[in-house]
Amino acid sequence: MAKSSSTKRRPAPEKPVKTRKCVFCSKKGKNQVIDYKDTQLLRTYISERGKIRARRVTGNCVQHQRDIAIAVKNAREVALLPFSSSTR
């Protein structure tokens, strides 16, 4: 049987996680309303492939991420936003 190596690995130092603040909860975003007709705002929360970006990527709080997801889905139904990207 082969002996296991006696050298122990040091655990990698943990990188500090940058927490992004919700844009809509901040002072300058208080007067912003999430609406399905505001496609310019909603496009910032959609990836190039047409998927809704995750909360950990956008930095939104739970409630505003839900509101964005609902608004994007409504805009897709009304054909203001595409369901998927046109490029392959």
From Swiss-Prot:
UniProtKB keywords: Ribonucleoprotein, Ribosomal protein, RNA-binding, rRNA-binding
GO biological process, one term: translation
Encoding gene per record: rpsR1
One Gene Ontology molecular-function label: small ribosomal subunit rRNA binding
Pfam families: Ribosomal_S18
Name listed for the protein in its UniProt record: Small ribosomal subunit protein bS18A
Assembly information from the UniProt record: Part of the 30S ribosomal subunit. Forms a tight heterodimer with protein bS6.
Protein family according to the UniProt entry: Belongs to the bacterial ribosomal protein bS18 family.
GO CC terms of this entry: cytosolic small ribosomal subunit
Domain of life: Bacteria
Function: Binds as a heterodimer with protein bS6 to the central domain of the 16S rRNA, where it helps stabilize the platform of the 30S subunit.
Species of provenance: Mycolicibacterium gilvum (strain PYR-GCK)
InterPro entries the UniProt entry points to: Ribosomal_bS18 (IPR001648), Ribosomal_bS18_CS (IPR018275), Ribosomal_bS18_sf (IPR036870)
